[in-house]
């Protein structure tokens, strides 16, 4: 994309993309954290009412959350705590960049709905770490590769409320 390789926590192919992603190096991780922070700061400077950070649906941050797509053996892979590290570091940099008085929403999939992906218990644990980093959480379900609808108009209203109510209980955030 844009003449650059797709980045991912590990070189694990996706059925959606036809290219093998490049495993992120320590330098990539550092740069991407700063890119998120810079983008959030620009949103604030340009008059946005808040910023949303997408940790759902098989996008980059959610790839780190899943043992299926995150097969790293360093501090960003393996244990649940390590898989949470990069998304939490991104959110910490975003919060630092925009300040406490600017709303930050985090979008998560309450479950990846993938055989070897993450489940609700994982996301309850992740959401419990968002206090001070986020002001609210938007909850959906699944990834684009999951066998459930992902397009909003294909999903009945309230379909993921069972996931969001559990996330709210563990995070204390709306």
How should each PLM-predicted stretch be described?
Residues 1-174:
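Flavin-dependent oxidoreductase catalytic cores
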């Amino acid at each position: 994309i844009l003449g650059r390789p797709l980045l991912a926590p590990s070189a694990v192919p996706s059925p959606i993309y036809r290219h093998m992603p490049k495993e992120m190096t320590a330098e990539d991780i550092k740069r991407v954290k700063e890119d998120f922070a810079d983008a959030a700061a620009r949103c604030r400077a340009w008059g946005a009412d808040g910023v949303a950070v997408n940790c759902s649906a098989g996008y980059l941050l959610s790839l780190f959350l899943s043992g299926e797509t995150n097969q790293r053996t360093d501090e960003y892979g393996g244990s649940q705590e390590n898989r949470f590290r990069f998304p939490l570091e991104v959110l910490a940099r975003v919060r630092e960049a925009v300040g406490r008085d600017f709303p930050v929403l985090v979008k998560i999939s309450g479950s990846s709905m993938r055989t070897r992906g993450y489940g609700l218990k994982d996301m309850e644990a992740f959401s419990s770490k968002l206090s001070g980093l986020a002001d609210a959480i938007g909850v959906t379900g699944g990834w684009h590769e999951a066998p459930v609808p992902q397009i909003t108009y294909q999903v009945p209203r309230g379909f993921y409320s069972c996931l969001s109510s559990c996330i709210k209980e563990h995070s204390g955030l709306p």
